[in-house]
């Protein structure tokens, strides 16, 4: 989306970390792993190297381009939205949630519970070893973050509450969903 709005192939470092491991000392993709990837796919004879196809990783505050005329037209077909608006490095909901809860400093964290649930903890140092349950990402400013994620959170709860709602309605009861969620 950002590329279509600005013409720049960039990502916020937090989103970039979800795509490929980051070297937090350089605020960039982990070059050792980039080299290993290129080495592994070399026998296939691709015409590109990994860095050729990955968006540039940017930390918060870096120049991520401006809204172009073409981008403005995608957002507003009436033409009232003007080009030239500065754009920040694009981040996803996890990075946005960290900023919104002021959980971007070392030894802070946040929990987000919705359809899925995840905990984000800003680390002082790298973990001693990999854990399959933990994804390593970064804050929008490039600090290392351990993220534990589950795809199911409120989706299961919603399904069960719906079962009880349907039962109550079948029994002729009026259902207040706030009370139903609070009770269950």
Question: What function would you assign to each model-found segment?
Answer:
Residues 2-15, 20-47, 61-184:
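Active-site core segments that coordinate phosphate-bearing ligands/cofactors
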